[in-house]
């Protein structure tokens, strides 16, 4: 997180340089400075051209091609989601520790980038650093049902759903600065069977562990669907206790 920035100056610059918007109008209508000024809760994605400029001058080595900031409930504080740790296996504790070390180095470089290149962030100061890495995906349990990209809209999926997701299929490359972002055609359901391990009794799954493929997980991994899946697992557990 950072403080001591001038968001209005940043948005003025963004308004004058539309090439620095990472999400285009034909993808998200109304994704513009007017929206950002009116919304206390937003996620800005862009500054592609400024990052290209910084890379050309040797000032940006983070494997990202876009700057992302997210507003927080704390006035005057922004969360920066622009680091990326690649080419590690996050299921290996040693590699995870090395990734955390790399993350700290990236924070230093990102602060220097913001101070030097981003209008409105010339005097920005570091407010906090996450104590852990945000790991998108490692292992999944094998459930009694596995939801895949091919079956996410199947009739039986809708009938058996205990939660839904409407977020994009948002796959971040683990080896380079690339994101595959594909809108979902419509909200899709997550069947109860994806929460039930195939070979373990007395356990229900939630969050990153559910039985889905990478494409489905790229949508279902975000907060809204995870909250819904967690509630479904808790409800099922309570019903199981009630029924003995």
Regions found by a protein language model. Give the residues of each.
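Flavin (FAD/FMN)-binding glycine-rich loop and adjacent Rossmann-like elements that form
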Residues: 1-244
């Amino acid at each position: 997180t950072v403080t001591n920035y001038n968001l209005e100056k940043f948005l003025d610059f963004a308004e004058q340089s539309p090439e620095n918007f990472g999400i285009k109008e034909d993808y998200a209508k109304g994704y513009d400075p007017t929206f950002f000024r009116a919304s206390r809760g937003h996620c800005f994605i862009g500054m592609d051209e400024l990052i290209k400029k910084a890379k050309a001058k040797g000032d940006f080595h983070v494997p990202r091609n876009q700057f992302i900031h997210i507003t927080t409930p704390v006035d005057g504080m922004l969360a920066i989601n622009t680091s990326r740790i690649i080419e590690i296996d996050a299921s290996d504790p040693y590699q995870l520790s090395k990734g955390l070390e790399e993350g700290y180095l990236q924070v230093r470089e990102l602060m220097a980038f913001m101070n030097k290149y981003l209008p409105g962030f010339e005097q920005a100061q570091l407010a906090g650093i996450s104590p852990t890495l945000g790991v998108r995906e490692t292992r999944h349990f094998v459930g009694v049902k596995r939801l895949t990209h091919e079956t996410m809209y199947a009739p039986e999926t809708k009938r058996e759903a205990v939660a839904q997701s409407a977020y994009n299929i948002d796959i971040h490359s683990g080896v380079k600065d690339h994101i595959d972002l594909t809108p979902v055609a419509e909200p899709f359901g997550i069947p109860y069977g994806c929460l039930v391990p195939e070979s373990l009794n007395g356990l229900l799954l939630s969050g990153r562990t559910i039985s889905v493929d990478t494409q489905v997980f790229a949508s279902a991994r975000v907060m809204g669907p995870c909250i819904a899946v967690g509630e479904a697992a808790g409800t099922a557990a309570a019903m199981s206790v009630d029924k003995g």
